[in-house]
Amino acid sequence: MSHSVGNNDLGDVKDVTGSVSGIFGIDSLALFGSEAGGTDAASALQKSIDYSKKAAQNGAIVTLSTHMPNFTNAKIKKNADGTYDFYNCDFNEAKDLSGDSLKKILPGGEKNEVFKAYLDTIAVYANALEQENIPVIFRPFHEDTGGWFWWGSANTAESYRSLYAYTRDYLESKGVHNMLYVYSPNGPLETEAEYMSRYPGDACVDILAFDSVSYTHLRAHETSAHL
């Protein structure tokens, strides 16, 4: 179980069990939007930082997942000062498969600057936690073996690996060194070869995992056994 970020004291788990949860999970949607109670991009980021710090102070492990928007989506607005506003983007934009987004956000692509702006905010979040020696388990581009997200199976394995490696390299160039990177394809997975078919490589990945949603306990157990 994880803390809820929809209130000020993160007390839901404690109210039920008598103790705070050991894992605090947050998504990048909270860094940019209203999930953590922010009323604009700046307050969303600050609330996400504050909640994460408080959870860590209470002994929790902090995790960050990402449901990044399709960076060709019209909900992304460019401000007059040249910055980008992702506040109105939600889960649905991660499922927007149009526009060949992955190709366009890599170096040389027309949306690379937009993607870097998004990563810059993730870097601000991570660096704020690193100042207090708080590590973050970072799970970007999960369920890549499925076809429902723009970074998923419609792209080649080579393109996906390039995206993953570029993301880590860029964040490290921004001074982010407190993240443990997770590779988490969609289960069930029957063989090692199937699991490794899009694996970004040991230089990029610190933790192996998988996503298993709406499957029976048996199928999740089978995938765990294969790993």
Segments and roles (model prediction):
Residues 1-23, 38-41:
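N-terminal module-boundary/linker segments of secreted carbohydrate-active enzymes
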Residues 6-13, 47-48, 121-124, 187-199, ...:
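Alpha-helical scaffolding within the catalytic cores
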Residues 22-27, 61-65, 136-140, 180-183, ...:
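Structural recognition of the beta-strand scaffold that forms the well-ordered cores
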Residues 29, 67-69, 141-143, 184-188, ...:
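Active-site beta-loop-alpha junctions enriched in small/polar residues
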Residues 41-166, 176:
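Substrate-binding cleft of extracellular glycoside hydrolase catalytic domains
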Residues 139, 172-192:
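Aromatic-lined carbohydrate-recognition surfaces of secreted/lumenal glycan-active proteins
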Residues 196-215:
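Aromatic- and acid-rich polysaccharide-binding/catalytic face
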Residues 216-225:
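Conserved small/polar residues in nucleotide/adenosyl-binding loops
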